[in-house]
Amino acid sequence: FLELAPSPAPRQAIEEVVQPTSEDFSALVLKIQANMDPNHHDRIVFMRICSGKFEKGMSVLHRQSNKTIRLSQPQQFLATERTIVEDAYPGDIIGVFDAGTMGVGDTLCAQKHKVTFGDFPVFPPEFFARVSPKDTMKRKQFQKGMTQLAQEGAVQIFEQPGALDSFVVGAVGMLQFEVLEYRLKNEYGVDLLNHTLPYSVARWIDGDV
């Protein structure tokens, strides 16, 4: 299979075109998944190695926060099985634990050679709803769950000034609201109130006042 698969391609960064043959490490965050282990409520960041060699326990620069992060316990997944990764190369996708620092589209790179990959495209939502917890005593779990699921890209959150117990959320399809409701109930123990809103677009308006 590896002999038939295409080689890793160069990737355009803001500063330059990153070649997979470069010795300087760089990686792009492709996906975030919370609660892959329901017993530990972990948060796994999946990243694609774009250049250089990944080694277990290495420290890299997170470009968006400009902080140094140590990538410990890197893993690869096959169904429910997890395998610790000692090293990885361009084209490989690995998962690492994250406490909430990284987001989809973020860049990790070597300190000595800084690059920044462009943002991921975000599809504009076409359906909107106001969601809130049925039990107001579970506001903390509700806010945590909404934040983590929005970071995954399950829905987009549009915050309302002063609203702590509800969020306006947007989705590309109605199925996303069902997924949101199911995951909040099963992963965070929060039953959801979902009120559909009569909107179809959300846009930033530029202009002079």
Regions found by a protein language model. Give the residues of each.
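Structural and coupling elements of P-loop NTPases
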Residues: 1-209
